[in-house]
């Protein structure tokens, strides 16, 4: 069993989750006893980059940005998944973009996640339109109709994604950046807008692509973790080089 969690994972143990409390609960042992099988717990963005890697065998340095209810970053550096000393590497959603900004469940103010996540952007759209309920399909439909509030939300997505990628480039210098988000899945041309917004001369060789796997990238990453352990191998690709 492989579980993808929105939070910090270290050695199959949950250290921090921003929107629910699991840090005091040994979920791995509980599921192991319940189902009598090995259990792997990993950050969902890390699973996402492993899923993407399975179809991109020619890259050794990949940054995969997952934008859903939060914002996560999976990093594959020099051929290895990078999680840092205690699993906190890749928590790009909790880097600060406004020191006096919105409160975040992590305890800080102005975290990127509070401006870039689909949850945050849909909340902004709901407040701007005074609608009782919104979802991404509604936002998408109104964007296609050139609704000014929907356009403003898409512009904010491009703005904060540009900030996010600029920071990633300067910190990790990946070969390729993959964006896994409903925005870029349904509107892949947004990646070109983001590229045009990256003004630094350091970014000339960068490749930015929308994920072709979307939600299945996490699933495929989970499969990769379990199969590699079962076969006792270090590398697994779903396509040939």
Where are the model-predicted features located?
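Active-site nucleophile and cofactor-binding loops and adjacent substrate-binding regions
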Residues: 18-20, 40-43, 66, 209-216
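Glycine-rich phosphate-binding loop and adjoining helix at the ATP-binding site
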Residues: 1-61, 189-199
